[in-house]
Amino acid sequence: YRLVDGDQAHYFDTTGTGNSLLVRSPAVLQLIMDSLRYWVTEMHVDGFRFDLASTLARQFHEVDKLSAFFDIIHQDPILSQTKLIAEPWDVGEGGYNVGGFPPLWCEWNGTYRDTVRDFWRG
Protein backbone atom coordinates (compact mmCIF):
# COMPACT_ATOMS: atom_id res chain seq x y z
CA TYR A 1 0.00 0.00 0.00
CA ARG A 2 1.00 3.62 -0.29
CA LEU A 3 0.63 6.25 2.39
CA VAL A 4 0.35 10.00 1.90
CA ASP A 5 3.87 11.47 2.11
CA GLY A 6 4.48 12.75 5.64
CA ASP A 7 1.17 11.34 6.91
CA GLN A 8 1.30 7.76 8.16
CA ALA A 9 -2.46 7.71 8.88
CA HIS A 10 -3.91 8.17 5.38
CA TYR A 11 -3.61 6.18 2.18
CA PHE A 12 -2.57 7.74 -1.12
CA ASP A 13 -5.02 6.85 -3.88
CA THR A 14 -4.93 7.70 -7.57
CA THR A 15 -7.05 4.73 -8.60
CA GLY A 16 -10.46 5.79 -7.39
CA THR A 17 -10.95 2.19 -6.27
CA GLY A 18 -9.17 2.15 -2.93
CA ASN A 19 -5.43 2.40 -2.48
CA SER A 20 -2.45 2.77 -4.78
CA LEU A 21 0.54 0.45 -4.67
CA LEU A 22 3.92 1.87 -3.71
CA VAL A 23 5.51 0.64 -6.95
CA ARG A 24 8.81 2.41 -6.23
CA SER A 25 9.29 -0.05 -3.35
CA PRO A 26 11.69 -2.84 -4.42
CA ALA A 27 9.57 -5.48 -2.64
CA VAL A 28 6.37 -4.38 -4.40
CA LEU A 29 8.12 -4.19 -7.77
CA GLN A 30 9.57 -7.68 -7.25
CA LEU A 31 6.14 -9.07 -6.35
CA ILE A 32 4.63 -7.56 -9.52
CA MET A 33 7.43 -8.91 -11.71
CA ASP A 34 7.29 -12.39 -10.17
CA SER A 35 3.52 -12.49 -10.66
CA LEU A 36 3.73 -11.38 -14.30
CA ARG A 37 6.50 -13.89 -15.07
CA TYR A 38 4.46 -16.67 -13.45
CA TRP A 39 1.47 -15.94 -15.69
CA VAL A 40 3.67 -16.00 -18.80
CA THR A 41 5.82 -19.05 -17.99
CA GLU A 42 3.31 -21.24 -16.13
CA MET A 43 -0.09 -20.17 -17.47
CA HIS A 44 1.14 -19.32 -20.99
CA VAL A 45 -0.55 -15.94 -21.32
CA ASP A 46 0.94 -13.80 -24.07
CA GLY A 47 0.22 -10.35 -22.70
CA PHE A 48 -1.33 -8.12 -20.09
CA ARG A 49 -3.75 -5.22 -19.93
CA PHE A 50 -2.98 -2.89 -17.05
CA ASP A 51 -6.04 -1.10 -15.70
CA LEU A 52 -5.27 2.42 -14.45
CA ALA A 53 -1.70 1.98 -15.71
CA SER A 54 -0.68 5.56 -14.93
CA THR A 55 -0.84 4.63 -11.24
CA LEU A 56 1.92 2.05 -11.75
CA ALA A 57 4.19 4.71 -13.27
CA ARG A 58 3.89 7.21 -10.43
CA GLN A 59 7.22 7.58 -8.68
CA PHE A 60 6.06 10.24 -6.26
CA HIS A 61 3.10 12.35 -7.36
CA GLU A 62 3.72 12.67 -11.08
CA VAL A 63 3.52 9.97 -13.74
CA ASP A 64 7.10 9.13 -14.76
CA LYS A 65 7.54 7.67 -18.24
CA LEU A 66 11.00 6.50 -17.16
CA SER A 67 9.80 4.83 -13.96
CA ALA A 68 11.39 1.66 -12.62
CA PHE A 69 8.19 -0.22 -13.50
CA PHE A 70 8.62 0.41 -17.22
CA ASP A 71 12.39 0.02 -17.11
CA ILE A 72 12.39 -3.38 -15.44
CA ILE A 73 9.70 -4.77 -17.78
CA HIS A 74 11.64 -3.58 -20.83
CA GLN A 75 14.82 -5.23 -19.52
CA ASP A 76 13.16 -8.50 -18.61
CA PRO A 77 13.86 -11.23 -21.21
CA ILE A 78 10.41 -12.78 -20.71
CA LEU A 79 8.12 -9.82 -20.14
CA SER A 80 9.64 -7.65 -22.85
CA GLN A 81 8.35 -10.21 -25.36
CA THR A 82 4.71 -10.02 -24.21
CA LYS A 83 1.88 -7.79 -25.36
CA LEU A 84 1.57 -4.83 -23.00
CA ILE A 85 -1.63 -2.81 -23.09
CA ALA A 86 -2.13 0.22 -20.86
CA GLU A 87 -5.29 1.93 -19.80
CA PRO A 88 -3.28 5.18 -19.82
CA TRP A 89 -4.97 7.16 -17.08
CA ASP A 90 -5.83 7.26 -13.42
CA VAL A 91 -7.74 9.79 -11.31
CA GLY A 92 -4.65 11.52 -9.91
CA GLU A 93 -3.26 14.87 -10.99
CA GLY A 94 -1.73 14.59 -14.46
CA GLY A 95 -3.08 11.06 -14.76
CA TYR A 96 -4.39 11.27 -18.35
CA ASN A 97 -1.45 9.98 -20.41
CA VAL A 98 -2.86 8.84 -23.76
CA GLY A 99 0.09 8.82 -26.17
CA GLY A 100 2.61 9.03 -23.36
CA PHE A 101 3.55 5.43 -22.67
CA PRO A 102 6.99 4.12 -23.71
CA PRO A 103 7.75 1.87 -26.70
CA LEU A 104 6.53 -1.75 -26.41
CA TRP A 105 3.25 -0.49 -24.93
CA CYS A 106 -0.08 -0.23 -26.72
CA GLU A 107 -2.67 2.07 -25.25
CA TRP A 108 -6.33 1.44 -24.65
CA ASN A 109 -8.22 4.67 -25.11
CA GLY A 110 -11.65 5.76 -23.99
CA THR A 111 -13.06 6.15 -27.49
CA TYR A 112 -12.04 2.61 -28.40
CA ARG A 113 -13.35 1.24 -25.11
CA ASP A 114 -16.71 2.95 -25.53
CA THR A 115 -17.05 1.78 -29.14
CA VAL A 116 -16.34 -1.84 -28.19
CA ARG A 117 -18.67 -1.61 -25.20
CA ASP A 118 -21.48 -0.23 -27.40
CA PHE A 119 -20.89 -2.99 -29.96
CA TRP A 120 -21.18 -5.75 -27.37
CA ARG A 121 -24.26 -4.20 -25.81
CA GLY A 122 -25.93 -4.01 -29.22
Residue ranges and their predicted role:
Residues 44-46, 59-60, 65-122:
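Conserved alpha/beta catalytic core and glycan-binding cleft of carbohydrate-active enzymes
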Residues 1-45, 49-75, 94-95:
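Substrate-binding/active-site clefts of carbohydrate-active enzymes
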